[in-house]
Amino acid sequence: MLRFPQYHLLFGPVSINPEYGQASKELILSYLRHNRLADDLVPFVRAKNPPRAMSLHEADLDVLQRCAFDLEHVSGLVSDLEPDAKQVPVLLKHYLKLNGRLITFNVDDSFGGCLDGLIVVDLTKVDPKLLAAYLTEEGARSFLEYHDFHA
């Protein structure tokens, strides 16, 4: 990003391990679809193998969603649902803290049935202090100045 500051969009897959229970995956997926979907980009991408229809009853999912005000609540609910108390995947949390948005979801059978989300992060929309943690203060300042942002 420092060598080529004209590029400010990052995109790629972020995975939810198939070891997560179905209820946890559905809760995470539902939260992402309702709160972090890149609606403007959805029409341009189609998953080869989209996740099947949810197995949770709509009423059950609705109750879980009402308890999930933000990502930390979702993570806590997932931890309660999982036998080993794992939470929302760490990499996914990091991308979401960078204001990442999901475009579509795909089940990757060649990777053990992982649930993959195609995520996009616009680095010009990341909090400058958080950006500095990745690019250094000087790097973040230089990057943002290139894009006419003044932190």
Predicted features along the sequence, with ranges:
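Terminal substrate-recognition subdomain of acyl/acetyltransferases
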Residues: 2-151
